Regions:
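N-terminal Lys/Arg-rich, disordered targeting/topogenic segments
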Residues: 1-21
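Bacterial extracytoplasmic/cell-wall-associated proteins, especially those involved in peptidoglycan
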Residues: 2-5, 48-196
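Bacterial N-terminal signal peptides that target proteins for export
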Residues: 21-34
Length: 196
C-alpha cells in the first residue's frame, strides 16, 4: 500500500518516505490541520445558531404580544417595525435588545436583584404592563404563526409593508409623539410612522 510509512532508524520520532509518497503525507497532514481549523470555525456558528434562535424568539414574542389579534399582514408590519429599529443607529442593534429596551426599576434591582421594567417606559407596551409574558398554551397556533413570520422577517423573505416605519400605535390612541413623525400606512388596528 502506498501510504505505508516506516519508522526511521536514525530518528525514532520521525517517519521516512518508502514509496515516494511524501506529498500525500503532507496533503493528509494539511487536510487534518484544515479539518481542525474548520472545526474551530464551525464552533462559532453554534453561538450564531443560539443567537439566531434567541433573536427569532424575541422577534416572535414581540409580534405575538403586539399583533396576535391582527391579520398576517398586521403581524408582519409589527415585525417590520422591530426590524427597522434594529437597522437604525438610534436603537439597539439586535432584536432582543430592541424588544426589551426599557427603563428598569432601581428599587426592584436593589431590593430583589431583579430587572423589572418601569410601567409605560418600554419600547413595546406589553413588556412593561405588569402581566405575565408567557405565551398561553391555548394560543399555540398564533404563537407558531408569530415564529414563522419572525423567521421570514429575519431572513428577509418579506417586503417592508410599513415603508420604513419605526413606530406605530393603535388607532384608538393619540400619542403626542405621532405629530413629529411621518405617517407611512395603516394596517389593521395600527397606524405606522417613520421618523425622517
Amino acid at each position: 500500500m502506498f501510504l505505508k510509512l516506516q519508522k526511521s532508524k536514525n530518528k525514532p520520532k520521525e517517519y521516512r518516505d518508502i514509496n515516494g509518497t511524501a506529498w500525500l503525507t503532507k496533503l493528509i497532514k494539511n487536510f487534518l490541520l484544515l479539518k481542525f481549523s474548520l472545526a474551530m470555525i464551525v464552533a462559532s456558528p453554534i453561538s450564531y445558531a443560539s443567537n439566531f434562535h434567541e433573536e427569532i424568539t424575541c422577534l416572535a414574542t414581540n409580534i405575538y404580544w403586539e399583533a396576535r389579534n391582527q391579520t398576517v399582514s398586521g403581524m408582519i408590519a409589527v415585525g417590520m417595525v422591530t426590524k427597522n429599529r434594529v437597522k437604525r443607529n438610534t436603537f439597539p442593534n439586535t432584536y432582543c435588545d430592541v424588544v426589551y429596551e426599557a427603563k428598569m426599576s432601581k428599587w426592584w434591582k436593589e431590593h430583589h436583584n431583579k430587572d423589572i421594567p418601569v410601567r409605560n417606559k418600554c419600547q413595546f407596551s406589553w413588556y412593561c404592563d405588569g402581566l405575565s409574558d408567557k405565551i398561553p398554551s391555548y394560543d399555540r397556533e398564533v404563537w407558531e404563526v408569530s415564529l414563522y413570520i419572525a423567521r421570514g422577517i429575519y431572513t428577509d423573505r418579506y417586503v417592508d409593508n410599513t415603508f420604513g416605519a419605526t413606530h406605530y400605535h393603535a388607532y384608538y390612541v393619540s400619542p403626542k409623539w405621532a405629530r413629529k413623525f411621518r405617517h407611512t400606512t395603516t394596517i389593521d388596528d395600527h397606524i405606522f410612522y417613520r421618523y425622517d
